[in-house]
Amino acid sequence: MKHLIYLIIGIAVTVLFFILSCSDGFNIYEQLFFNQGFNDKMYNLSMYPVIAAITIAVAWGGAAIYYYAINSVKFDRWYHWLAVLGVVAVLAPVVCYIYNDTVFANNGLMYVGESIQFEMQTVLFAVLLYVVASYSMRWWSSNCRHTPLPQ
């Protein structure tokens, strides 16, 4: 029962992140990085929900791959978990940058520098969501449930 509560809390935190990423009044992305023209274009082109969804998918997908696809005794150490975290921290902003660049290019806009700065917070959110996902789903892994910290 305790493990199910962890999963529910993880899902709730992730949904809250998505809601705060898409809201009009308080957008978590705009609170951490604000550039008037850049943020206006991202909002008008409805890019925030897609960026949030990509970040969530990469973070939860990375955790699922580690705990259920890899799930090996040879890879149940904290540094293997940290390596997957590193992959998530690199992959999420790269995919989001490619999406940003494609949408802006299709609309005749160039925000290269702003996009790179913006993706630094994607690194932060991807890492936080990966940790949340890890603690939410690790309990059902047969070999890696003790990673990154023992129970």
Question: Which functions belong to the PLM regions below?
Answer:
Residues 1-59:
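N-terminal signal-anchor transmembrane alpha-helix
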Residues 6, 51-52, 80-88, 118, ...:
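Alpha-helical transmembrane segments of multi-pass membrane proteins, especially transporters
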Residues 6-10, 14, 104-151:
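Alpha-helical membrane-associated segments of multi-pass integral membrane proteins
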Residues 8-12, 65-69, 75-95:
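Transmembrane alpha-helical segments of multi-pass membrane proteins
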Residues 13-17, 62, 88-96, 125, ...:
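Alpha-helical transmembrane segments of multipass membrane proteins
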Residues 18, 22-25, 66-71, 96, ...:
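Membrane-water interface at transmembrane helix exits
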Residues 27-49, 93-121:
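Interfacial non-cytosolic loop connecting adjacent transmembrane helices
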Residues 49-77:
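Canonical alpha-helical transmembrane segments
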